[in-house]
Amino acid sequence: EVVKNAAEVLEKVQARTEVVGIDEGQFLGDGLIDVCMGMADAGKRVIVTGLDTDYLGRPFDPMPRLLAVAEEITKLLAICVQCGNPAVHTQRLVASEDLIVVGAAGMYEPRCRRCFEPQLAHEKIAAEKKNVPAQAAGPNRKQDI
């Protein structure tokens, strides 16, 4: 069931619930840590998935703070669509300065450290403002390395 914030998670959990699974934890706000800690203190197993960095490669709160208090961490990596190496970043392919842009297929793709272009979304915004094709907006980082 979809929830909009961490407080709504508690509304869905029943006293007899033993395991709570939360997907896309980065979207649930700062209350996520207290909610998870409270459920764990109550004896529930809490499993949270989410992105630890945003489209610019910066820590994506509240996930880094949740990682700091987690008892067990498993970091899963995708495969870079550019070169096939392990992907540690999420590349935004659309023009937007918003931190959160809920996307469909083709808006994001997994990238490794070498192929990740954090400035790409900003270059696309600048290109749209100038009405210039996005590839002409700036250097291709992969060719510069």
Kindly give the residue locations of the regions a language model identified.
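Extracellular and organelle-lumenal recognition/adhesion modules and their flexible linkers in secreted
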Residues: 16
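Short acidic-hydrophobic, aromatic-tinged amphipathic segments that line or gate anion-handling sites
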Residues: 1-5
